[in-house]
Amino acid sequence: MQSEALRNPRVIVVQKLYSQEFNKESKLTFPKHRYKKFIKDVVLGTLERKELIEETIRQHLSEDLSIKRTEKLLILLLQAAIFELLYRPQTSVNIIINEYLNTSKFFLEQSQKNI
């Protein structure tokens, strides 16, 4: 199950975004993968439109929340999902939401194992 999740393209997208967030100088690489083009498109598209996506998130946060106080992993998940919702209309909204919910479960399970 875990190795299957690690091959999930959206898990890889979030891992790439997380890596880039904390090591901005590192060069992004996209190893051979069945969904390499998808992964690359979502990662690069999310990074290119980061400010616009963050503004979209800010508009929908309640007043007592802020992006800076929200866990970074959650923000990255939201950024990638919002990118797909806005810029990849060929994928159904239901599929995007379901896939990112599953992706968030994977990362939650990983963080609980490390406690």
Which sequence ranges carry the predicted segments?
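N-terminal interaction/assembly modules
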Residues: 1-115
